[in-house]
Amino acid sequence: MQRVTITLDDDLLETLDSLSQRRGYNNRSEAIRDILRSALAQEATQQHGTQGFAVLSYVYEHEKRDLASRIVSTQHHHHDLSVATLHVHINHDDCLEIAVLKGDMGDVQHFADDVIAQRGVRHGHLQCLPKED
């Protein structure tokens, strides 16, 4: 492990310290390492051809005109990416779905965009993790 010195603005250092405390880091180095890993993983998952895993979560209105069938159709068109799907009834009108995906990150992003763009889908979020060799 290498020791490095960095210079931060006072406001940025204050934000780092606050983040470190909220997340329970023992020191700034641990926080900075995690932030850097997260940034590198995000960049890696945005490159077409990168293999990885992802979690797609979204809320949708199940009574919205043909929305459930459109989502299922989209899932079937991308069946090769799907590892598992969890379906939760939030209330009478809304459902939460969480899909675990695996494959080319470009294809995963395309699938997520197709689902999230459907009218009636809300709170769509894709969390990607590059596959580590």
From Swiss-Prot:
Domain of life: Bacteria
Cofactor(s) this protein requires: Ni(2+)
GO BP terms: negative regulation of DNA-templated transcription initiation; regulation of DNA-templated transcription; response to nickel cation
Zinc-finger found in the keyword field: no
Co-factor note (free text): Binds 1 nickel ion per subunit.
Task performed by this protein: Transcriptional repressor of the nikABCDE operon. Is active in the presence of excessive concentrations of intracellular nickel.
Protein name per UniProt: Nickel-responsive regulator
Organism of this sequence: Escherichia coli (strain K12)
Gene it is expressed from: nikR
